[in-house]
Amino acid sequence: MKERGLNPRDLIPYIGSQSGVYQILLGKRGLSMPMARALHKHLGISAESLLREPVPGPMPSNESTDGMRWDRFPLKVMVKRGWIPDGPNLAGRSEELLRGLIDRAQGGNAPALYRKNDQGRINAKVDPYALKAWCWQVMATANERLPVANYEPGVVTLDFLNQVAQLSRLGDGPRHAKDLLEEHGIPLVILPHLPRTYLDGAALRLQDGRPVIGLTLRYDRIDNFWFCLLHELAHVGRHLNGSESDAFIDDLTLRKSDGRPEDPREAQADEWAEEALIPSEVWEATDMRNSPTAIGLLSLANELKIHPAIIAGRIRFERKNYRLLSQFVGAGQIRRQFDAPNSDSKW
């Protein structure tokens, strides 16, 4: 199939259904002679390969789906958002519909790695099925809109993050950041979170190794956007360049939560994001930490060539006072740049 540029969807007319295709690819079901003849005649697949003893795999996901409760996915919400097609008996067709999404995600690795990352920043109340669905849709969207440029491992450095951070001073900086990432082969997907995902963003890897960043824009503020973006970029630069596949799924409200086990990689991503936005030597020397003023905030932002919201956000976070400097954080300024819906619909 790979040699002929075929994907599982191409087999459906000759196998009969999408679920049947996946059962055959998994080795759970054999080809009938009429199916084999049709595949050989219409798709040119050699008789030798069709008659070969089936081997389990490759499954279009890197996790086993044994025991998967397909009907527990938020199917109605997914239909409403256009992630899966509508039709009668959604629950009865749930496996077929979800395998179609997995196919579009090209077997994304996020679901299997959800368990590996569960000591990171995943909310204890999360619905794992909704979280998997969101990750698959991010990867499916990225696959459908792949940047022309190839991704070169090692391109995402602290200097690169600093370059991205300085785009924040532009009125349409978020759009420029998306363009810059795509110029380096990294898709940025803006996708509203699903109920009970408690999610801000994720750094995932596509099947070919290309990283993809997904952001929910759960909190529509300038300061939040830039920290979330740089945090996920830091995961790309520091943690996704190895040979081991991985995924990082983040509820950033859990950042530095007291008494919660912390994945050291999350602290490393925080470190890069903070350093790229406001270098530590500058932050430690400024009076803004203890005596913030509007004039001082604007002056420091101008010196660092970043948006004032970033400094306001850092002060608010460190003081745990989210009423402070609220006029500077740029509430309501991000979603509209991505043609994103307002809080009355998907957000």
Question: How would you describe each model-predicted region?
Answer:
Residues 2, 20-21, 29, 37, ...:
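Active-site hotspot residues in diverse enzymes, especially metal/ion-binding acidic/histidine motifs
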Residues 6-20:
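Short alpha-helical DNA-recognition segment
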